[in-house]
Amino acid sequence: MSILSFLLGEKKKSASVAKERLQLIIAHERAGGHAPADYLPALQRELVAVISKYVKISHEDIRVSLERQDDLEVLEVKIEIPQA
């Protein structure tokens, strides 16, 4: 990090912001046990908004699911991106 970027501030990239949000969600879920995943619709809407900045997609093109098996939780995101 340079002194100039420190003084002027540097805008975070959307990928790092999304990563931080996902880490917070996962940490919250792990701390609270097996609470219902009521954040999934909001997560799906946010993903559509972010990806729509770069590629034309609709709400139906993204599927988000959370699977639990014993002590393992898997957040799965499937995105259909149209061909150019």
Swiss-Prot record:
GO biological process terms held by the UniProt record: cell division; regulation of division septum assembly
InterPro entries: MinE (IPR005527), MinE_sf (IPR036707)
Family (UniProt): Belongs to the MinE family.
Function: Prevents the cell division inhibition by proteins MinC and MinD at internal division sites while permitting inhibition at polar sites. This ensures cell division at the proper site by restricting the formation of a division septum at the midpoint of the long axis of the cell.
Gene behind this protein: minE
Protein name (Swiss-Prot/TrEMBL): Cell division topological specificity factor
HAMAP family per the UniProt record, alphabetical: MinE (MF_00262)
Keyword set, alphabetical order: Cell cycle, Cell division
Gene source species: Paraburkholderia xenovorans (strain LB400)
Source lineage: Bacteria, Pseudomonadati, Pseudomonadota, Betaproteobacteria, Burkholderiales
